[in-house]
């Protein structure tokens, strides 16, 4: 089932960027992945010509995520994005859907934490239609109040359907505790409390303030030349006014000086445990070493230390993992596990022990080599479609990685040493300052 909070907060763009950049490697050719062009209206175009099929894929990131929505209007950015396809000054929602379906294409818009995202895929012969539709939904939404009310009801129903899911309850409590009043800390409950008060004016004002060519990155991959795509984008996005982008008031992330336990009562047989703290941003120089370190700790599936200890040696859980959510601002470091209520304390203790061990003991040569081989070896699967290439292009621009990023990546990973692992583990893992959320039958879990 979809996690509504994650859909609202992180959206498609963030999920694609994190997945692609976490494992990108070296391209076979030594040339840059694409070309960067700034259009007359300020829009940044990244183009990768790919002539093997008569198809064009477009990925857009617009600086209109929940980071810039007013603090007292959680969910506004995501709702605005979700309404763009529901009617424009030229087309209603049915017409938009029918026109793209008729040519066998796809068109989508969604909200996220740092960015809103849009995607388009059409045959080369239908590129004009596709760009006409894309520019129309981005530039000319009408935000019909009936559509707003329908989308609000739909979102609230989704939140309500998940309200009793232990994993969602734990995730929301963890997010709120770690990020506080920062935009990354907004939860299902925050969104549900505000959405019913939304009006057309709220969406129109947000759209007018943050949607514009100067806030947009557009990646194009496929059977189209630079001259052709520049001409088409100039044509279909001509007259799109630059966004004023008022500076949002963003609450700082809270500092944490101690370990906190949040015990939530629920009549269930399995305790749902999430523990962690604020992690790193994607642009942190330690990103690559942290990526390798976390693979060894808990990101490497069945080969990770957490899995070896908690699943294989102790039989406490089927799965346990850790992750760093690296975004424009520091995301969360978290470790998650489900175990019997009675073994909750043991599972927590073992996770904390592994956090301490990787901070104090060098990893083995084998662990380091295996992590590097896996991370760099995943590259072919991360650039095997035009959509994935477009996602990487967008990420390259967002995080200032350079168009030669795929060529540099293996060296960046392979340069990580055991000393680097120890250094970044000490810097970015803090077992004495974690938030520990336990959703369980507390009489049996006896969390302390």
Identify the role of each PLM range:
Residues 11-23:
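Bacterial N-terminal signal peptides
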Residues 2, 38, 95-245, 263, ...:
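Charge-rich, well-structured scaffold segments of protease-associated domains
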Residues 30-61:
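Mature N-terminal segment immediately following signal peptide/propeptide cleavage
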Residues 1-8:
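N-terminal secretory signal peptides that target proteins for export/translocation
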Residues 50, 59-61, 245-303:
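His/Glu-based metal-binding/catalytic segments typifying zinc-dependent metallopeptidases
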Residues 31-34, 59-121, 186-187, 301-316:
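M16/MPP (pitrilysin/insulinase) zinc-metallopeptidase core fold and M16-derived inactive scaffolds
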Residues 24-29:
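Boundary at the C-terminal end of the N-terminal hydrophobic targeting segment
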């Amino acid at each position: 089932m979809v996690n509504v909070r994650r859909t609202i907060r992180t959206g498609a763009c963030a999920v694609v960027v994190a997945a692609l950049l976490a494992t990108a490697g070296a391209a076979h050719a030594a040339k840059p992945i694409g070309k960067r062009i700034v259009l007359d209206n300020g829009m940044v175009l990244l183009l990768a010509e790919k002539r093997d099929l008569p198809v064009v894929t477009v990925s857009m990131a617009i600086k209109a995520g929940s980071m810039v929505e007013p603090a007292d209007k959680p969910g506004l950015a995501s709702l605005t994005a979700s309404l763009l396809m529901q009617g424009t000054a030229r087309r209603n929602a049915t017409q938009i859907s029918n026109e793209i379906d008729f040519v066998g294409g796809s068109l989508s818009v969604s909200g996220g934490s740092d960015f809103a995202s849009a995607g388009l895929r059409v045959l080369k012969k239908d590129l004009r239609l596709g760009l006409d539709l894309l520019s129309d939904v981005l530039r000319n939404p009408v935000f019909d109040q009936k559509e707003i009310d329908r989308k609000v009801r739909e979102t609230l129903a989704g939140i309500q359907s998940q309200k009793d899911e232990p994993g969602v309850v734990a995730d929301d409590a963890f997010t709120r505790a770690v990020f506080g009043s920062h935009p990354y800390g907004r939860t299902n409950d925050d969104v549900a409390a505000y959405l019913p008060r939304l009006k057309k004016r709220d969406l129109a004002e947000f759209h007018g303030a943050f949607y514009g060519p100067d806030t947009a990155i557009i990646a194009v991959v496929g059977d189209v030349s630079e001259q052709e795509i520049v001409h088409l984008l100039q044509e279909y996005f001509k007259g799109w006014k630059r966004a004023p982008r008022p500076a949002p008031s963003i609450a700082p992330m809270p500092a944490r000086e101690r370990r906190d336990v949040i015990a939530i009562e629920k009549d269930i047989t399995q305790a749902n445990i999430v523990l962690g703290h604020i992690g790193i941003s994607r642009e942190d120089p330690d990103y690559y070493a942290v990526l390798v370190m976390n693979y060894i700790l808990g990101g490497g599936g069945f080969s990770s230390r957490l899995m070896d200890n908690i699943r294989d040696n102790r039989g406490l859980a089927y799965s346990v993992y850790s992750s760093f959510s690296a975004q424009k601002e520091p995301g969360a470091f978290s470790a998650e596990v489900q175990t019997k209520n009675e073994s909750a304390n043991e599972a927590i203790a073992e996770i904390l022990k592994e956090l301490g061990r990787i901070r104090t003991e060098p990893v083995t040569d084998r662990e380091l080599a295996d992590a590097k081989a896996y991370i760099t070896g995943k590259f072919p699967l991360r650039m095997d479609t035009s959509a994935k290439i477009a996602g990487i292009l967008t990420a390259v621009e967002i995080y200032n990685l350079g168009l030669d990023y795929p060529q540099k990546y293996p060296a960046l990973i392979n340069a990580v040493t055991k000393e680097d692992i120890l250094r970044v583990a000490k810097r970015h893992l803090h077992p004495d300052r974690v938030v520990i959320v336990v959703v369980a039958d507390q009489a049996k879990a006896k969390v302390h």
